């Protein structure tokens, strides 16, 4: 018996690459730009707005720090207590890497330690529930 040819083996990872690119989350500096008060804020969903059918929960319950959508507010609140969310808040508390810091690292200045930034713990675009108790 001879050796079998592995035809098409060079295309084996193309689907995995597509899925990896599809699930890619925004980088920390992009999230910092969103969370800054002077940055352009992402518009909050209106209560009477039409939900986006492509996003979980219609895109109404989003954690800005983790850039994730959730199906309802209960899952969003559970996420706020999770280890992944707390780890992301710790990553966001460090000032993002800047051009000035890169120049200092290249020898064009003295080292300045990155500042710690205050990040709100519950950062979401959740629509508050209407009070119907009266």
From Swiss-Prot:
Organism expressing this protein natively: Mus musculus
On assembly, the entry states: Associates with pre-60S ribosomal particles.
Quote the protein name from its UniProt record. Answer: Zinc finger protein 593
Secreted among the record's keywords? no
What domain of life? Eukaryota
Q: In which residue ranges is the amino acid composition biased (Basic and acidic residues)? A: 26-36
Ranges annotated as biased composition (Basic residues): 1-25
Entry GO CC: cytoplasm; nucleolus; nucleoplasm; nucleus
What are the GO BP annotations of this UniProt entry? positive regulation of transcription by RNA polymerase II; ribosome biogenesis
């Amino acid at each position: 018996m001879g050796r079998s040819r592995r035809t098409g083996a060079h295309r084996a990872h193309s689907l995995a690459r597509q899925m990896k690119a599809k699930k890619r989350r925004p980088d920390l500096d992009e999230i910092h730009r969103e969370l800054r008060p002077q940055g352009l804020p992402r518009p909050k969903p209106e209560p009477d707005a039409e939900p986006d059918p492509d996003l979980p929960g219609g895109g109404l319950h989003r954690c800005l720090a983790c850039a994730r959508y959730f199906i309802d507010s209960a899952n969003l609140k559970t996420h706020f207590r999770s280890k992944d969310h707390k780890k992301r808040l710790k990553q966001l508390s460090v000032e993002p890497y800047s051009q000035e810091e890169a120049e200092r690292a290249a020898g064009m200045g003295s080292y300045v330690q990155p500042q710690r930034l205050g990040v709100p713990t519950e950062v979401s675009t959740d629509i508050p529930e209407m009070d119907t108790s009266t």
